[in-house]
């Protein structure tokens, strides 16, 4: 009888220890998730970024084509009309382009009709890298998630007619269609504006 009581006590102790352990793990996960949400909230609220030389750039959120994805766009940038976009870009013309006065710094968004699922983004990124590396210098590439959307990213230097262009490009699936967003500037402006480009590209978020 005594042994039986001891066994029950041991089992009860183990159960209590397991319950306490589970509670601690749950608390840790909740705190971690709260910190993550707080960090994301703070990121969304920051609307200013400085260039390398310290010039403060003020941005505002822009929703593209009434879609439920948003990017921070510098307030000083102007949206180009179709004729200007067509002259500036050869081949696949973006739907929307925001530029500085000199049109040397741009944020371009292509809302394509190409079928693309969320799960295809990884293979599309790899295909793009293979295509681009022949005529461009690939700086880096990445694959990550934003609000459960897979995002492919490629940074590269491409050649234009009389200069070289720094590109920070992301692509993702929205409504099962491919969307491409690119921040670009001439390589002469890359050092000054690269952090601003990162700020713009990394500001992407989706609202359900």
Model-predicted regions and their roles:
Residues 2-93, 184-208:
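N-terminal targeting sequences that direct proteins away from the cytosol to non-cytosolic compartments
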Residues 2, 86, 125-173:
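Signature of long, low-cysteine stretches enriched in small and polar/charged residues
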Residues 147-208:
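Short, well-structured beta-strand
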Residues 74, 121, 125, 129, ...:
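Extracytoplasmic/secreted envelope proteins and their assembly/folding machinery
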Residues 67-69, 73, 94, 150, ...:
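Envelope-exposed proteins and targeting segments
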Residues 94-123:
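A short acidic-to-branched-hydrophobic micro-motif
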Residues 60, 94-96, 150-154:
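Short beta-strand micro-motifs in enzyme catalytic cores
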Residues 66-70, 102-104, 160-164, 176:
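Glycine-centered tight beta-turn/hairpin loop motif at sheet-sheet or coil-to-beta transitions
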């Amino acid at each position: 009888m005594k042994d039986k009581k001891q066994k029950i006590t041991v089992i009860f102790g183990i159960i209590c220890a397991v319950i306490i352990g589970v509670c601690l793990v749950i608390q840790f996960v909740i705190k971690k998730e709260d910190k993550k949400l707080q960090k994301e909230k703070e990121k969304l609220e920051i609307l200013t970024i400085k260039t390398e030389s310290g010039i403060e750039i003020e941005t505002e959120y822009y929703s593209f084509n009434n879609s439920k994805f948003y990017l921070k766009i510098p307030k000083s940038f102007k949206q180009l009309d179709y004729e200007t976009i067509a002259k500036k870009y050869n081949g696949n013309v973006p739907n929307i382009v925001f530029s500085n006065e000199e049109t040397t710094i741009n944020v371009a968004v292509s809302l394509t009709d190409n079928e693309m699922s969320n799960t295809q983004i990884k293979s599309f990124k790899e295909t793009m890298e293979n295509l681009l590396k022949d005529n461009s210098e690939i700086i880096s590439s990445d694959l990550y998630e934003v609000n459960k959307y897979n995002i492919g990213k490629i940074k590269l230097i491409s050649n234009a007619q009389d200069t070289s262009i720094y590109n920070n490009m992301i692509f993702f699936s929205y409504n099962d269609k491919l969307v491409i967003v690119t921040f670009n500037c001439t390589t002469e402006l890359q050092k000054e504006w690269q952090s601003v480009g990162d700020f713009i590209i990394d500001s992407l978020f989706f609202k359900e």
